[in-house]
Amino acid sequence: MADQVSSDEEVWSEREFVGHDFRDDDFSRLRTERSVFDECDFRGVDFTESEHVGSAFRNCRFDRATLHHSIFRQCSMLGSVFTDSRLRPLTLVDVDLTLAVLGGCDLRGVDLTGCRLREAGLVDTDLRKAVLRGADLSGARLQNIRLDEADLRGARTDATLWTTASLRGAKIDVDQALAYAAAHGLNIHGE
């Protein structure tokens, strides 16, 4: 059975919420540790300066939520949807965003090093100057994504990234440069 919400708590440890409606709640400065939120509604929730360690936010809605100055470490946001949310500045360390929908979000300059964004919806997302070193973008939907001046070195990507994204000034490694060339039909020879 899911725990009941108590507004006077600042640390939620090992709690579970399923299908809970948190709409317009104030979670600023809240800390969660190993807590699970399944199919919860966070529309309009203020997460300002909150910190989350080892918590899971699976298939949750974050419409008009405020997550700026928040920290997420070793968290899962599997299948969660972010619409019209204020997300930066934001700290994400080893976060699983597999199947998450971040389409149209402003993630300029956010450090997503090592994050998993497999099959994530990133259509029209602004990731200019973001750091995606070692991130996994396999199978992500990337139409009209903006990655100008982003650091993509070591990121796992599909060929669609190289043909659909805006990449002016992006930092890539040699293997990615070859993948970019191949995606654009270039025939590369050593001699």
Predicted regions: what is each one?
Residues M1-E191:
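Tandem repeat scaffolds
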